[in-house]
Amino acid sequence: MKMTPFSVVILAAGKGTRMYSDLPKVLHPIAGKSMVKHVIDTVKQMDAKQIHLVYGHGGDLLKTHLKTEPLNWVLQAEQLGTGHAMQQAATFFADDENILMLYGDTPLITAQTLTRLIAAKPANGIALLTVELADPTGYGRIIRQNGSVVAIVEQKDASPTQLTICEVNTGVMVASGASFKKWLSRLNNQNAQGEYYITDIIAMANQEGYSVQAVQANTLMEVEGANNHLQLAALERFYQQTQAEKLLLSGVSLMDPHRFDLRGSLQYGKDIQIDVNVILEGEVKLGNRVRIGAGCILKNCVVGDDVDIKPYSVFENAIIGNKAQVGPFARLRPGAKLEAESHVGNFVEIKNAHIGKGSKVNHLAYVGDAEVGENCNLGAGVITCNYDGANKFKTTIGNNVFVGSDVQLIAPVNIADGATIGAGATITKNIAENELVISRVPQRHIQGWQRPTKKK
C-alpha cells in the first residue's frame, strides 16, 4: 500500500531559559551536532514532502546555522504554546497530506519509530507517540477509554487520579493536514498556563468520533528532550554509549566504551584498537589494523592500514598513509598528507604539507606549506619559515635529503635530491643536488674566561 505523502513540522521557537545561554535551546549540540540538526537529518531519511521549521527566539542564529537545509521557515513571534506554534504553520498544510509534528530538542528520535507512528495513523484520526515512565512528573498523562486515547492532561491541570498514570505524551503526533487545520482553528487558552495546547485536539477528535491511537517509543531516551545542561549531558552519554556498543559489536576494540566519543561518522576496517578518551569528529575513515592511543582527537581524517597513532595527538583534515607512525603529542593541521611508512614524532606540527614515503620528522619541528620527498630526515627543531607577516610561501624538499637539527628554511626555497644541511643553518637560497650546506657562526674559544659574579 502506497504511503500518503507527508510533511513535517519541527517546533524550535523556545528560548530554553534553563540553559542559561544566549544560544537558542535547539542549537545546543549532541555529539558535535545541534539538536535540531539531528532531528532534520532523521526526517531527511524519510522522504518528507516538506519540512516546516517554526522559529522564534534566536531566529537569526538558527537561519545562519541551518542555511543549507531545505526548510520552510515559519515565524512564531510570541511563544504561546505548542498549539499556537502549529497554528502559524497550518497555512502551509495541504488537506490531503499527513502532518508529522516533532520537536527540535528531541535529537535522538529515530526514523524507524516515526515510520511506525505514521503507519499507525487511522483514517481522519490521530496517531500519538507515547512512553511509559516510572516517574511521570511533569509530563502530560495519556487518558484512555477502552484502549483508545480520549485525552491528554497536562501536569498542572491533572486530577490526583490522573497524576497516577504512567503513560505519558511525548508531544510527537501525526494527523492529516485537513484535520489539523480544522482542530487548530478551535483551540483556546483556557488553562492554568494561558497557552494553546496542541493536546486539546485529542478531545476534539474523540468528540467527532475519530480514532486516536498511541504508539509507544522503543526507548525513553529517543523521545527525551533537553531543557537544561544536565539533561543535555544525559542525552550525550546515552548517544555515545549507543555508538560505542555498535562499534564493539562490529569488531572495533574500545579499551573503555564509557570514555570514547564519536561526534560524526566513522568508516573502519578490521582489527581497530582505540584507547581511552579518544574523540572522533566529522567524517573519519580508518583502514585495517589501525591503533589509536589515549587522548587522541581526529577530525575529518583518512587513515590507511597499519597506522600507529600514539597518545595525545590531534589531527584535522589530514590524510595518513599505510604503516605511518604519528605521535605522541603530534599535530596534523588541515592539508597535512603523510605517505606510507612516514614518521611524525612528538611535538611536531604539520600544516598544508606533504611528507613523502619513508620520510621522518621525529622531534620538535614545524613543517608548513611544504613538499617533502621520500626517505628524508628532518631533525629536531627544523622549521619551515613560511610566513612573512603578510603572505605564505612554499618550501620544496627533494628525495633523500638530510636536514640537521635547528635548521630554519626561509621560504620560498628549494632543496634538491640528496642534499645535506648541517645543524643550525639558516637557509635562504636554493640548494643543488647532493650538496652539503653549512651556515653557522664560526666557533670561538676564549681562554681563561671569567664568568660574571653576583654583587653582594
Swiss-Prot record:
As recorded in Swiss-Prot or TrEMBL, the protein's gene is named glmU
- Whether Transferase counts among this entry's keywords is yes
Instruction: Write out the catalysed reaction.
Output: alpha-D-glucosamine 1-phosphate + acetyl-CoA = N-acetyl-alpha-D-glucosamine 1-phosphate + CoA + H(+); N-acetyl-alpha-D-glucosamine 1-phosphate + UTP + H(+) = UDP-N-acetyl-alpha-D-glucosamine + diphosphate
Task: Please give the name of this protein.
Answer: Bifunctional protein GlmU
Q: Which CDD domains match?
A: GT2_GlmU_N_bac, LbH_GlmU_C
Record-annotated residues binding acetyl-CoA?
A380, N386, Y387, S405, A423, R440
**Gene Ontology biological process terms from the UniProt entry:** cell morphogenesis; cell wall organization; lipid A biosynthetic process; peptidoglycan biosynthetic process; regulation of cell shape; UDP-N-acetylglucosamine biosynthetic process
Q: Which Pfam families would you find in this protein's record? A: Hexapep, NTP_transf_3
Q: Where is this region: N-acetyltransferase?
A: 251-456
> Record-annotated residues binding UDP-N-acetyl-alpha-D-glucosamine?
11-14, 25, 76, 81-82, 103-105, 140, 154, 169, 227, 333, 351, 366, 377
Which leading EC class covers this enzyme?
A: transferase
Enumerate the subcellular locations listed in this protein's record, separating them with semicolons.
Cytoplasm
Q: What does this protein do?
A: Catalyzes the last two sequential reactions in the de novo biosynthetic pathway for UDP-N-acetylglucosamine (UDP-GlcNAc). The C-terminal domain catalyzes the transfer of acetyl group from acetyl coenzyme A to glucosamine-1-phosphate (GlcN-1-P) to produce N-acetylglucosamine-1-phosphate (GlcNAc-1-P), which is converted into UDP-GlcNAc by the transfer of uridine 5-monophosphate (from uridine 5-triphosphate), a reaction catalyzed by the N-terminal domain.
Task: Return the cofactor note field.
Answer: Binds 1 Mg(2+) ion per subunit.
Region annotation (Linker) maps to 230-250
HAMAP family associated with the record: GlmU
Molecular function, one GO term: magnesium ion binding
Q: Where is this region: Pyrophosphorylase?
A: 1-229
Show which residues constitute the signal peptide. none
Entry keyword Cytoplasm? yes
Q: How does it assemble?
A: Homotrimer.
The cross-references to SUPFAM superfamilies, in alphabetical order and at most eight, read:
Nucleotide-diphospho-sugar transferases (SSF53448), Trimeric LpxA-like enzymes (SSF51161)
Instruction: Specify the pathway.
Output: Nucleotide-sugar biosynthesis; UDP-N-acetyl-alpha-D-glucosamine biosynthesis; N-acetyl-alpha-D-glucosamine 1-phosphate from alpha-D-glucosamine 6-phosphate (route II): step 2/2; Nucleotide-sugar biosynthesis; UDP-N-acetyl-alpha-D-glucosamine biosynthesis; UDP-N-acetyl-alpha-D-glucosamine from N-acetyl-alpha-D-glucosamine 1-phosphate: step 1/1; Bacterial outer membrane biogenesis; LPS lipid A biosynthesis
EC nos:
2.7.7.23, 2.3.1.157
Q: Which InterPro entries match?
A: Bifunctional_GlmU (IPR005882), GlmU-like (IPR050065), GlmU_C_LbH (IPR038009), Hexapep (IPR001451), Hexapep_transf_CS (IPR018357), MobA-like_NTP_Trfase (IPR025877), Nucleotide-diphossugar_trans (IPR029044), Trimer_LpxA-like_sf (IPR011004)
Query: Keywords, A to Z?
Result: Acyltransferase, Cell shape, Cell wall biogenesis/degradation, Cytoplasm, Magnesium, Metal-binding, Multifunctional enzyme, Nucleotidyltransferase, Peptidoglycan synthesis, Repeat, Transferase
